[in-house]
Amino acid sequence: MEITTIDTKSKLKLNKEIFAYTYNEGLVHQAVVTFMNNARSGNSAQKTRSEVSGGGKKPWNQKGTGRARAGTIRSPLWRSGGVTFASKKRDYSQKLNKKMYKRALRSIISELCRTGNLVVVSDFQCDNHKTKDFLKKMNQMEISSALIIMSEVGENEYLGSRNLIDYDICDVTTIDPVSLLRFEKVVVTEAAIKKIEEQLQ
């Protein structure tokens, strides 16, 4: 299996086991859900009526005042009271076996390759850290939204792209299923291709 680099027009051989893998939609969905759940902090919490400070004394007598009966100022019906069904801290993290995770990444990368959304370049380097120069480089490649995967991310490339919502840049070790699916294109350097093949073997 071969792919042509868009800058030098040279042919690059790809490993069929990684770049021509059968697409498994269920596994990809599981990998995406697991990744997003693992990113959740789960720190949202409120207090029930028993946890809110104060409210131990009955506000007024049960009868004789003409007011509605009340047993505590921390009732959920009251201002500053507890929450009826208070949410608590919880762990949303899920486990996905390494083999399954690798297969999910293979599925996504292979599908990108099949649909023509995987773009290979011989190298990707920016002369400076300016965002306008980074955008100019991407416009020359006619790519409006992309994840750029490099073997090692340089400072200029990182600084030039970090303020743009339509572009993201990462090295091979930090590839994740959500980023691969989020952008229109995935731009990969030749050096990164070799590392991806080693990592997902």
From Swiss-Prot:
Gene3D superfamilies reported in the protein's UniProt record: 3.40.1370.10
Cystine pairs: none
Keyword Ribosomal protein: yes
Any GO CC annotation of this UniProt entry: ribonucleoprotein complex
One GO MF term: rRNA binding
UniProt xrefs under PANTHER family: 50S RIBOSOMAL PROTEIN L4, LARGE RIBOSOMAL SUBUNIT PROTEIN UL4M
UniProt xrefs under HAMAP family: Ribosomal_uL4_B (MF_01328_B)
Protein's name according to its UniProt entry: Large ribosomal subunit protein uL4
Species name: Legionella pneumophila (strain Lens)
Protein encoded by which gene: rplD
